[in-house]
A protein has these predicted regions:
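Phosphate/nucleotide-binding beta-alpha loop and adjacent structural elements of enzyme active sites
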Residues: 1-201
Length: 201
């Protein structure tokens, strides 16, 4: 029944955590760009973060070409700037992840190893002169907590709306809540079936 609940939550939106025209959106774990396309149609400016070049070349670039306000960022989103070793699942477009986050099931699948540049969202904002971030969506296969740790300045200064998947690691909800509130105690957080939504009123 979990998949039904996911559908009921909508496309990474819930309550006050919703896309609005003119929003600057960070789509972390853009994959094929489905959420990026939705945000684009709302009139948002989208930065689509995707770590795997094959996914960008075969899928995400096509989505971006059909929507003029999507900019692709070929980075893994992390808590420091470094190079990460990734496993790209050859038979599953949505299961690629940093090697030290792999589980046994993923480890047994056909995969290609590659080195991927990682960046923090705070560093990306600084390097690109981005004046605000209105919405952050994150589905990055267990690295969500690292993303949040690398976005502390964004959470404090911009109070971005957050839509974050919580089903990758058992303690995700607790860890995310602690990181978010430590960065900005004004956040109001709602936990649903497989996602966490947060905003500052």
């Amino acid at each position: 029944m979990k998949h039904v609940s996911n559908v009921n939550e909508g496309p990474y939106e819930y309550g006050e955590v919703c896309l609005k025209e003119g929003d600057i959106v960070f789509d972390c774990g853009a994959n094929r760009g489905l959420f990026s396309a939705v945000a684009s149609r709302y009139g948002c400016q989208v930065f689509a973060f995707e770590a795997i070049p094959d996914i960008i070349d075969n899928y995400l670039s096509k989505t971006a070409n059909m929507n003029g306000n999507i900019r692709i960022a070929n980075f893994a989103v992390w808590d420091k700037e470094e190079t990460l070793n990734f496993s790209h699942m050859l038979d599953h477009i949505g299961a690629s992840r940093c090697d030290h986050l792999r589980d046994e099931i993923v480890a047994r699948k056909k995969r290609k190893h590659l080195a991927v540049p990682a960046i923090t969202l705070d560093a990306f904002v600084g390097k690109n002169g981005i004046e605000r971030v209105d919405f952050i969506k994150s589905d990055i296969e267990g690295a969500e907590r690292n993303m949040l740790r690398g976005a502390r300045k964004i959470l404090k200064e911009f109070a971005s709306k957050l839509s974050i998947c919580t089903y990758h690691l058992p303690d995700d909800p607790q860890v995310f809540r602690e990181i978010i509130l430590d960065a900005n105690p004004k956040y109001q957080i709602v936990e649903k079936f497989s996602k966490m939504y947060a905003h500052v009123p």
